[in-house]
């Protein structure tokens, strides 16, 4: 779609998003989606808008832009649909491959939570965006950077406290489903549990050192805790991380060896 005809900037995009994501759940879906496409037809100057016309344009655009094929529009999908490319700051977060590992997510989190407060402040978010623009070799004025920072805060800061938490950043980066959800440890035999453990450890041991350290521990803790508490804060994560290290890090080297984690879980790991 040639979205330039709408001549939108980031602030106007925010206004459209907030208007049609009426229930503030992070998606435009159902009746909201129909109302959005009706609005789009009016913007295009379409006369005599009918339900069939709305359905037709909806089918056409959803097949092109609903990347996740879930019948609803996420923020990034809507931005791709209606923002001109030079205004689509969300393109900065587009990745060659989906972010499907919490280890990489936590590496990003630790980098930009500069003061280790458990939150990303507006200043830290501004630095985050500036860093992304530099990575993409794009020049941006200070005023434009401020505008994008403000828009990002309003789009993703769900509780309106002026700072982003883990869940806000997960939405921005489109973090994939929790890796641990596929495992049902309680219903498994001992052999199945050992096999699952090997798969799980290999997933989080991104560096392949035989030990979890730094963001590898963070990623494991995040996914493990979110099995029982779907939305944890950065502060909660740091607490749970320290509890896990106190319990499992027998040799106190700040890492969790494969054998140490197996012992904590009542298993014997393969060498």
From Swiss-Prot:
| Source superkingdom | Eukaryota
Q: Which CDD domains match?
A: EFh_HEF_SCGN (cd16178)
Which residues belong to any copy of the EF-hand domain?
8-43, 53-88, 100-135, 144-179, 192-227, 235-271
Using the UniProt record, give the first listed, main subcellular location.
Answer: cytoplasm
- The chain's coiled-coil residues are none
Q: Which residues bind Ca(2+) 4?
A: 205, 207, 209, 216
The entry's Ca(2+) 2-binding residues are 113, 115, 117, 124
A molecular function annotated in GO for this UniProt entry is: calcium ion binding
Q: For this chain's UniProt record, which GO biological process terms are given? A: regulation of long-term synaptic potentiation; regulation of presynaptic cytosolic calcium ion concentration
Q: Which residues bind Ca(2+) 5?
A: 249, 251, 253, 255, 260
Protein name as catalogued: Secretagogin
